[in-house]
Amino acid sequence: IYQPTSGQILLDGVDITHLSITERANLGLSYAFQQPVRFKGLRVKDLLSLAAGKNTSVNEACSYLSEVGLCARDYVDRELNDSLSGGELKRIEIAMVLARGTKLSIFDEPEAGIDLWSFQNLIRVFEKMYEQTRGSILIISHQERILNIADKIVVIKNGQVEKEGARADILPALLGSADAGSPACSVLADK
């Protein structure tokens, strides 16, 4: 994780700039990596329990797995090892974020390694999170398709904020530009 060279990172008015990942998580921030971390030796249910901070029942674990498009009975007792594909690991990681129920959920290119059918399911997961969330969802993506579910879009180019505003204001200009492939951060929920 890079340390910022200037500025602050605030979460609910609290400066979290120099806090560890664990300290940030304890304040209600979750992060799903572009390349999911492999927790070898753990079962999927155990990982979901760790994420939730409590012993998750099989029914709860199955609910989280079903929400991300995995057949729960095939995964709940499965070990996290090299037999899982990148897309499966990505979905399990998103299920972990759902289990945590945090104030701010950050997803770094959640569509990476996921096929088109799963991508549509992923969009539905984010829409459901948006409807049920008490916090905010931040999605970092290069995919135009994911921008359609954003409330707010922030376009970052060469490390600087280039454009920021409501989807209705930013998306038409972004899609019409030659730089439509620029990275964009989409804030879905800001409650």
Predicted regions and their residues:
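ABC ATPase NBD Q-loop/coupling interface
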Residues: 8-24, 81
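Q-loop/switch helix immediately C-terminal to the Walker
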Residues: 35, 41-60
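Conserved H-loop
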Residues: 142-148
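ABC ATPase C-loop
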Residues: 97-98
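Walker B catalytic motif
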Residues: 106-110, 117
